């Protein structure tokens, strides 16, 4: 579309595409070849009788684009469909269309929120073009470079000492052997032969074992696996038998074509495989700890066995990353995140935009619940299989876990859990928010502690601040005069005073889920986690959609001066939105409390599994 001009105002309208219309908006990610096909068709579409078409088949489909050079033929590109709103509640955005009205004015129209993403898969010509570009770049580099042989370098077979006899002097020991010069070319050939003999140790092994030990480190695509096998030597017979072998020992992913070694095959992996480097052996050690601690009777995971873990999840040091690797669609909620310590006191922090503040500026919905102790160091957990992997990016449960990447230090760091009192989600509570606050003069049920003059002055200064800065639902003594009793918080959150900071009853999951002592118990906990995580994600997505409008209005209100006309108008919009949500979402309060409960429960199960994996890794010889 045309670029927007500076210093010019545009009107933005919504609703041209109603909810009952047949128009859907998608976020489309094209490859270079697909983009060129579209541009070629648009440039000469008048001369082509066919029209582009798109067909959906579940979460997959294909796009057909006519070729101007061959009017009777069309290029077909396959794609897969992913849900942005479900995988990442904060990653969706709106689709804006720019058009010119009949009067010649430029308008912007919001067509709706983009919840789905179409990703076009790469074709063979894309890989062929990439290979040609790499070969051309390598040839140019080789033509401008030269091999410099240095003393002690890789091309020098051994150090040679040249000894010149003294002139005119006879050798006192005729039988002494003298060092003779060594031809440099022969030394290079010998060193190359020794390197080949080292690699031949792997090439002489059975082809099945070679494939099995490569897949034990990380998932491979078939093309990547062929390139890796060719380094150690690959015959045509082995190449032809690769497809059948992969069906026996690996799980094939229908989405990105990656091959992951089956869990039952890890028992045949040798830790002293000659093709493994020291780093590969350390990586294999961590993988075996995770795989072998699970009961073999469980077989594959609860999900589709073909849904193997994404490439790059394990063993990134084994081979360099590939350009066309697809990013993983999910992130393990039990995976290790960067070490982070929560600092929550008895007075809960104000909730802003539906989330609790974190000292380092990042956003977290909840601290990790822990046992009734001051702090509790959570042992880092190795990655779990894909069924436990929830959607990525800003996941509320992922925020309470540690992710140390794949640097080989998975179990050397920990996360400090929050104290036992659980802070509730700072999201709009549509019930029990209109209770009037207690006047200052009313007696309290329990006698408060005496406070120093310094603390009293601080509290008095905090109370004198404008109410617009406090995320409160209930009107208080210092509220704006004339505000109705059901005035919501300016960002849609409940009063901090309405959020309990402690509980008199022990949650049922603390009694049900104790420390893990066996692999069967660990598998049972993991199954319980998988059973309730989908419900938690759905609840969180619905709550996020409700609070998004309050977040936008709160940001506008903070930029206005209190008492101005714009301030009162925005405040009226907040009240209107609050009443609207209260009517249309009668079960919001129950869903919010259910989401908080599931968050604490799943975080507790995650911590127990992480501690068990840490103990298993420490006990590994």
From Swiss-Prot:
InterPro entries to which the protein is assigned, alphabetical: E3_ELL-like (IPR042065), ELL/occludin (IPR031176), ELL_N (IPR019464), Occludin_ELL (IPR010844), WH_DNA-bd_sf (IPR036390)
Intracellular or extracellular location(s): Nucleus; Nucleus speckle; Nucleus, Cajal body
Region (Disordered): 296-417, 431-504
Tissue: Expressed in all tissues tested. Highest levels found in placenta, skeletal muscle, testis and peripheral blood leukocytes.
Motif segment (Nuclear localization signal): 445-459
Biased composition annotated in UniProt, kind: Polar residues: 374-383
Entry keyword annotation includes Transcription regulation: yes
UniProt function note: Elongation factor component of the super elongation complex (SEC), a complex required to increase the catalytic rate of RNA polymerase II transcription by suppressing transient pausing by the polymerase at multiple sites along the DNA. Elongation factor component of the little elongation complex (LEC), a complex required to regulate small nuclear RNA (snRNA) gene transcription by RNA polymerase II and III. Specifically required for stimulating the elongation step of RNA polymerase II- and III-dependent snRNA gene transcription.
The protein's name: RNA polymerase II elongation factor ELL
């Amino acid at each position: 579309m045309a670029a927007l001009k500076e210093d010019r105002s545009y009107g933005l309208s919504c609703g041209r595409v109603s909810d009952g219309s047949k128009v859907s908006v998608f976020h489309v990610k094209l490859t270079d070849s697909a983009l060129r096909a579209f541009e070629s068709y648009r440039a000469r579409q008048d001369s082509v009788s066919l029209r582009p078409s798109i067909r959906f088949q579940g979460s997959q489909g294909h796009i057909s684009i006519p070729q101007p050079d061959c009017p009777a033929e069309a290029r077909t590109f396959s794609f897969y469909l992913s849900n942005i709103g479900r995988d990442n509640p904060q990653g969706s955005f709106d689709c804006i269309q720019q058009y010119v009205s009949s009067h010649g004015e430029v308008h912007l129209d919001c067509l709706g929120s983009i919840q789905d993403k179409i990703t076009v898969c790469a074709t063979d010509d894309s890989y062929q073009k990439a290979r040609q570009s790499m070969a051309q770049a390598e040839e140019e580099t080789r033509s401008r470079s030269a091999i410099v042989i240095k003393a002690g370098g890789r091309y020098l077979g051994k150090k040679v000492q040249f000894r010149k006899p003294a002139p005119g002097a006879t050798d006192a020991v005729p039988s002494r052997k003298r060092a003779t010069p060594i031809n440099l070319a022969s030394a290079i050939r010998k060193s190359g032969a020794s390197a080949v003999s080292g690699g031949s140790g792997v090439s002489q092994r059975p082809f099945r074992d070679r494939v099995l030990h490569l897949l034990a480190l990380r998932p491979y695509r078939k093309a990547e696996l062929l390139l890796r096998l060719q380094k150690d030597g690959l015959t045509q017979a082995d190449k032809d038998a690769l497809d059948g072998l992969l069906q026996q020992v690996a799980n094939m992913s229908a989405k990105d074509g990656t091959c992951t070694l089956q869990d039952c095959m890890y028992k045949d992996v040798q830790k002293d495989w000659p093709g493994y480097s020291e780093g590969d052996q350390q990586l294999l050690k961590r993988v075996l700890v995770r795989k072998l601690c699970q009961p073999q009777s469980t077989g594959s995971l609860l999900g589709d066995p073909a849904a193997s873990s994404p490439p790059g999840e394990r063993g990134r040091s084994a081979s360099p990353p590939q350009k066309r690797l697809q990013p993983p669609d999910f992130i393990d909620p039990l995976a290790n995140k960067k070490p982070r310590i929560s600092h929550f006191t008895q007075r809960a922090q104000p909730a802003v935009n539906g989330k609790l503040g974190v000292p380092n500026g990042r956003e977290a919905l909840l601290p990790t619940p822990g046992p009734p102790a001051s702090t509790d160091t959570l042992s880092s957990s190795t990655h779990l299989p894909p069924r436990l992997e929830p959607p990525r990016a800003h996941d509320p449960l992922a925020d309470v876990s540690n992710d140390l990447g794949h640097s080989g230090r998975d179990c050397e760091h920990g996360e400090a859990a929050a104290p036992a009192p659980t802070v509730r989600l700072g999201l709009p509570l549509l019930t029990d928010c209109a209770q009037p606050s207690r006047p200052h003069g009313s007696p309290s049920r329990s006698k408060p502690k005496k406070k120093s003059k310094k603390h009293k002055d601080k509290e008095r200064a905090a109370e004198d601040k404008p109410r617009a800065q406090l995320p409160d639902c209930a009107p208080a003594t210092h509220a704006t005069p004339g505000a109705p009793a059901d005035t919501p918080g300016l960002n849609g959150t409940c009063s901090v005073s309405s959020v309990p900071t402690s509980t008199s009853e022990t949650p049922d999951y603390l009694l049900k889920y104790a420390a893990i002592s066996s692999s069967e118990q660990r598998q049972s906990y993991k199954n319980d986690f998988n059973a309730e995580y989908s419900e938690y994600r759905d609840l969180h997505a619905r709550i996020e959609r409700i609070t998004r409008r309050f977040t936008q209005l709160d940001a506008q209100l903070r930029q206005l001066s209190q008492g101005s006309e714009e301030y009162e108008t925005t405040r009226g919009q907040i009240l209107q939105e609050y009443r609207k949500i209260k009517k249309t979402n009668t079960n919001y309060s129950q869903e919010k409390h259910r989401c908080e409960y599931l968050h604490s429960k799943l975080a507790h199960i995650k911590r127990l599994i992480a501690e068990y994996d840490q103990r298993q890794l420490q006990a590994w010889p």
